[in-house]
């Protein structure tokens, strides 16, 4: 920040009161103040907990770190209609609706406040995307909901773009399976979700190359 500063100069003869004088007020129009240094850092982990996640209000589901973007996380979650949830940087770190600086409901989930829980009006599968930013000595969060779109890209389908022909089918309930499109060639199966960033930041593949 830049601000004006006013001051006077005073002078005396050393060891004497003689010659004591004070200048007129001097104005310095622009003085740059010292930068405020925050003592907190972006979180390296993030968790979700709620009424539809594992054991209700007992399972802290870890989110996936976005590749190369510190403080950004995502997770694929099924919410029952009217489900509620919170989030935290670690287990038992209960953060709710009031902690969110900005909501971006890109999937029509119907997000609202319910006793500081985040309520999801419309049931179904969603991609939950959370961005944490440092704001002074606290965190500022942006919460986005996206449609549960998962795509195959790369050599197994011969396409490196989001292509509707290579999108997984989405189950209607939490017990269903996401079914991949038919692969057209051999190679490493590369998959990603779709959000407002580069696809390779949201990429995942088969565990141990098999499951």
Residue locations for each model-derived region?
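Insoluble glucan recognition modules
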Residues: 1-211
